[in-house]
């Protein structure tokens, strides 16, 4: 069986599982893991095929969620950033008894633009898939630059993301393509109407991948959830605004 890379740290009485985004790995959380591990028992995970979780091919969202769940604590707050938000959401839908609270960060239940739904144009995602075969590293770097564009700390935030990618071997092209396929095709807008655990959605006002227009739309669709927008953040608010991010999670802990 292929193994998911998993690291546990901290002594908190609540478990917090952190799931990273497309093309990256768990090293992306190093900017906040020390602070969080003083409040939570923290679980850092490389998604299947990414980082140190080698030996996986492209997986569907459901298979990715099941692979991650195999090593997870019985009950935890599940936090997913970007693509990781879809994985955390899938776990909340299929195994709600394992999820104390769901937190999505700069994530959308439907990343791809649809009729009357803002998102990434499908041809942009298809273009990334094509370019992966042509110039793998440059395509990943372009995607990372998109994630920090517009913020006051854009350059240093992009450097932090690039350092995370380069710290470990690059994922296989089919794994990256599989991740883009999930972003292109998955739509969890209606299923997530039915989750009953605390549900916190965090966004960056300047995010170029998850338009802020989706926030009021999802407030209406999911009235049981809460949303918060980081006024000066883009797609990686935990890198640009770590203190604010940390406070929101500690406040959530008091409620679960």
Curated annotation (Swiss-Prot):
GO terms for cellular component: cytoplasm. Keywords: Biotin biosynthesis, Cytoplasm, Hydrolase, Serine esterase. Residues 15-242 form the AB hydrolase-1 domain. Substrate binds at residues 22, 82-83, 143-147, 235. InterPro entries: AB_hydrolase_1, AB_hydrolase_fold, BioH, Carboxylesterase_BioH. Pathway: Cofactor biosynthesis; biotin biosynthesis. GO terms for biological process: biotin biosynthetic process. It is found in: Cytoplasm. Its main location: cytoplasm. The active site is at residues 82, 207, 235. Pfam families: Abhydrolase_1. It catalyses: 6-carboxyhexanoyl-[ACP] methyl ester + H2O = 6-carboxyhexanoyl-[ACP] + methanol + H(+). Monomer. Belongs to the AB hydrolase superfamily. Carboxylesterase BioH family. PANTHER family: HYDROLASE ALPHA/BETA FOLD FAMILY (PTHR43194), PIMELOYL-[ACYL-CARRIER PROTEIN] METHYL ESTER ESTERASE (PTHR43194:SF5). NCBIfam families: bioH (TIGR01738), PRK10349.1 (NF007674). This is Pimeloyl-[acyl-carrier protein] methyl ester esterase.
